[in-house]
Amino acid sequence: MQQLLTKEGFLLTSLDDLMRWARSGSLWPMTFGLACCAVEMMQCASSRYDLDRFGAGLFRPSPRQSDVMIVAGTLCNKMAPALRKVYDQMAEPRWVISMGSCANGGGYYHYAYSVVRGCDRIVPVDVYVPGCPPTAEALFYGIMQLRNKIRYRNIFDRKDA
């Protein structure tokens, strides 16, 4: 039946597959730039790298308008409640990219008393981008991994922290 309809020019899919495809192609990121990794993240939106090719070029100013939070840099204990508050203001479905060694696990400041040893202790992280600071290409790879995760996994199975 599907081959017959495909030959006639029809496309068979489920509504879930269509929604996953649409969400993966139109990510609206919000920056949570805390340190030097934010400079590399800003570079991604420039004309040399053109993040808009992946449907994620325009950074949103409000958490209510975005569905991807990119945490870039060192997260301090005083900033952790603000990060969680901004995350809670985002509409479902929402995703988090942890960018850089400091956001992933504390990085260079891992043993400092005022540093959170990874933003995954505050918000659930979907993709980790390694590096100090990670290059623009590494962030692109992380965004592509997030797109694949959105497209091929059920997004409502995740339990938030």
Curated annotation (Swiss-Prot):
Reading the lineage from the top rank, the first entry is: Bacteria
UniProt keyword Cell membrane present: yes
InterPro entries with a match to the protein in the record: NADH_UbQ_OxRdtase-like_20kDa, NADH_UQ_OxRdtase_20Kd_su
Taxonomic placement:
Bacteria, Pseudomonadati, Pseudomonadota, Gammaproteobacteria, Legionellales
Q: According to its UniProt record, where is this protein located?
A: Cell inner membrane
Query: GO cellular component terms?
Result: plasma membrane; respiratory chain complex I
Q: Which cofactor does it need?
A: [4Fe-4S] cluster
The EC number on file is 7.1.1.-
Query: Any note on cofactor binding?
Result: Binds 1 [4Fe-4S] cluster.
Under catalytic activity, the entry for this protein gives: a quinone + NADH + 5 H(+)(in) = a quinol + NAD(+) + 4 H(+)(out)
Q: Which GO terms describe its molecular function?
A: 4 iron, 4 sulfur cluster binding; iron ion binding; NADH dehydrogenase (ubiquinone) activity; NADH:ubiquinone reductase (non-electrogenic) activity; quinone binding
* Subunit comment: NDH-1 is composed of 14 different subunits. Subunits NuoB, C, D, E, F, and G constitute the peripheral sector of the complex.
Swiss-Prot/TrEMBL keywords: 4Fe-4S, Cell inner membrane, Cell membrane, Iron, Iron-sulfur, Membrane, Metal-binding, NAD, Quinone, Translocase, Transport, Ubiquinone
As for family, the record states:
Belongs to the complex I 20 kDa subunit family.
Membrane topology summary: Peripheral membrane protein
The UniProt record gives the binding positions of [4Fe-4S] cluster as C36, C37, C102, C132
PROSITE patterns, alphabetized: COMPLEX1_20K (PS01150)
**What is the protein name given in its UniProt record?**
NADH-quinone oxidoreductase subunit B
Q: Which GO terms describe its biological process?
A: aerobic respiration; electron transport coupled proton transport
Organism, per UniProt?
Coxiella burnetii (strain RSA 493 / Nine Mile phase I)
